């Protein structure tokens, strides 16, 4: 399975692509989409750069699914709103290509990648480097995006195991039925 991770940002959005085969995680690509060349007042143009950039990444690497970081509420409400718009442009680009999108908080990603939800950026970078056997540290935005892809790989495996357990338990005496509990 090929997974695209997205760390949305209005100035710099990170992306990371990994392949997952069983327990093996393989690095495919990572990078950033930058709007730093545009003035702050050009919000629609910046959102279009993000939308087009994500569409280009999807077309080039053909992921089967994507994971995006959930926006946290910042002290500055204006910053939170702007980040939400950047995130919306990224998600719209993904779903316009019919990609399923999973969402994870930064805390969930850090917990999955480092084992500690309050890890700092350098710890995330180092663990991503180790997990993907990279020769050097990825940049912070690309590392977060790769971390989101790794998080989704772990979550997808756990969900598959749960579904398999549901099927096994549901095939027994007929007393257990998968689905809603009553």
UniProtKB/Swiss-Prot annotation:
The active site is at 7, 69, 141. Its main location: cytoplasm. It comes from the Bacteria. It is found in: Cytoplasm. Signal peptide: none annotated. GO terms for cellular component: cytoplasm; Holliday junction resolvase complex. Mg(2+) 2 binds at residue 69. Mg(2+) 1 binds at residues 7, 141. Pfam families: RuvC. Its cofactor is Mg(2+). It is an enzyme of class 3 (hydrolase). Its EC number is 3.1.21.10. Keywords: Cytoplasm, DNA damage, DNA recombination, DNA repair, DNA-binding, Endonuclease, Hydrolase, Magnesium, Metal-binding, Nuclease. Binds 2 Mg(2+) ion per subunit. One of its GO terms (molecular function) is DNA binding. It catalyses: Endonucleolytic cleavage at a junction such as a reciprocal single-stranded crossover between two homologous DNA duplexes (Holliday junction). One of its GO terms (biological process) is DNA recombination. Belongs to the RuvC family. PANTHER family: CROSSOVER JUNCTION ENDODEOXYRIBONUCLEASE RUVC. The RuvA-RuvB-RuvC complex processes Holliday junction (HJ) DNA during genetic recombination and DNA repair. Endonuclease that resolves HJ intermediates. Cleaves cruciform DNA by making single-stranded nicks across the HJ at symmetrical positions within the homologous arms, yielding a 5'-phosphate and a 3'-hydroxyl group; requires a central core of homology in the junction. The consensus cleavage sequence is 5'-(A/T)TT(C/G)-3'. Cleavage occurs on the 3'-side of the TT dinucleotide at the point of strand exchange. Homodimer which binds Holliday junction (HJ) DNA. The HJ becomes 2-fold symmetrical on binding to RuvC with unstacked arms; it has a different conformation from HJ DNA in complex with RuvA. In the full resolvosome a probable DNA-RuvA(4)-RuvB(12)-RuvC(2) complex forms which resolves the HJ. This is Crossover junction endodeoxyribonuclease RuvC.
